[in-house]
Regions:
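A short, Lys/Arg-rich alpha-helix, primarily the initiator
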Residues: 1-18, 26
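Helix-turn-helix DNA-binding elements, focusing on the entry/boundary residues of the two helices
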Residues: 9, 20, 36, 51-54
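Low-complexity, intrinsically disordered/propeptide-like segments
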Residues: 12, 29-30, 57-60
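Short alpha-helical DNA-recognition segment
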Residues: 16-41
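Short, conserved catalytic or interaction motifs in soluble domains
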Residues: 44
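DNA major-groove recognition helix of helix-turn-helix/homeodomain DNA-binding modules
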Residues: 50-65
Length: 65
């Protein structure tokens, strides 16, 4: 069974010990409009983050390219 981008984002966030609120604050401080609702929407597969926002999240989660 394939994981969706959203499922993978949620798994990485939890594995990194980050809350949705922490990620919202981090993204907002980096110039992105990312409310907690927005992050839940990404994780539920209802929308997708921009590539730049995804890069910030990957760095916060310790995911390397």
């Amino acid at each position: 069974m394939k994981s969706t981008v959203g499922e993978t984002l949620r798994k990485c966030r939890i594995a990194a010990g980050k809350s949705v609120r922490e990620m919202s604050e981090l993204l907002t401080s980096n110039g992105f409009k990312a409310s907690e609702k927005t992050i839940y929407s990404w994780e539920n597969g209802n929308s997708q983050p921009t590539p730049d926002a995804l890069l910030v999240m990957c760095r916060a989660y310790g995911v390397e390219d």
